[in-house]
Amino acid sequence: MADQVPVTTQLPPIKPEHEVPLDAGGSPVGNMGTNSNNNNELGDVFDRIKTHFPPAKVKKIMQTDEDIGKVSQATPVIAGRSLEFFIALLVKKSGEMARGQGTKRITAEILKKTILNDEKFDFLREGLCVEEGQTQPEEESA
């Protein structure tokens, strides 16, 4: 019993897309890492992040859903890191859109245009404010 290795709760860092391991053929494993230039830029942005989402708060938010029972220790950490990657990508794409319009600021309108123009963010479209003159689909009540 004295030869047991202590169990640590610290997880290894999650590798961003630009650090995906290569298979024997020299291509990225899986379908990630298709555009290495954009991934390197996103990795640079992500490397500068000094703050992280607190896993305890992420866990509390996850457990507000009735369908979620027990949550392992790694799950909130991974969810927080995924959220950081997502936000970094949204800010990067919005910054490109702002530069394309000749401005240095990311406004709500630029965020909205980014979400509407990029298919990666199509799941956010239902949460956008609806323009005047457009009708928002009514939710069905059960």
From Swiss-Prot:
This is Negative cofactor 2 complex subunit alpha. Belongs to the NC2 alpha/DRAP1 family. GO terms for biological process: cellular response to heat; negative regulation of RNA polymerase II transcription preinitiation complex assembly; negative regulation of transcription by RNA polymerase II; positive regulation of transcription by RNA polymerase II; RNA polymerase II preinitiation complex assembly; transcription by RNA polymerase II. It comes from Saccharomyces cerevisiae (strain ATCC 204508 / S288c) (Baker's yeast). Residues 29-137 form the Histone-fold domain. The modification Phosphoserine is found at residues 27, 141. SUPFAM superfamilies: Histone-fold. Component of the NC2 complex which represses RNA polymerase II transcription through binding to SPT15/TBP and thereby inhibiting the assembly of the preinitiation complex. The NC2 complex may also mediate transcriptional activation from TATA-driven promoters through association with SPT15/TBP. Keywords: Activator, Nucleus, Phosphoprotein, Repressor, Transcription, Transcription regulation. It holds the Pfam family CBFD_NFYB_HMF. It is found in: Nucleus. One of its GO terms (cellular component) is nucleus. The keyword Metal-binding does not apply. Present with 5130 molecules/cell in log phase SD medium. GO terms for molecular function: chromatin binding; core promoter sequence-specific DNA binding; protein heterodimerization activity; RNA polymerase II general transcription initiation factor activity; transcription coactivator activity; transcription corepressor activity. InterPro entries: CBFA_NFYB_domain, Histone-fold, Transcr_DNA_Rep_Reg. Residues 1-43 are annotated as: Disordered. The gene is BUR6. Component of the NC2 (negative cofactor 2) complex composed of BUR6 and NCB2. The NC2 complex associates with SPT15/TBP. Interacts with SPT15/TBP. Residues 1-11 have a biased composition (Polar residues).
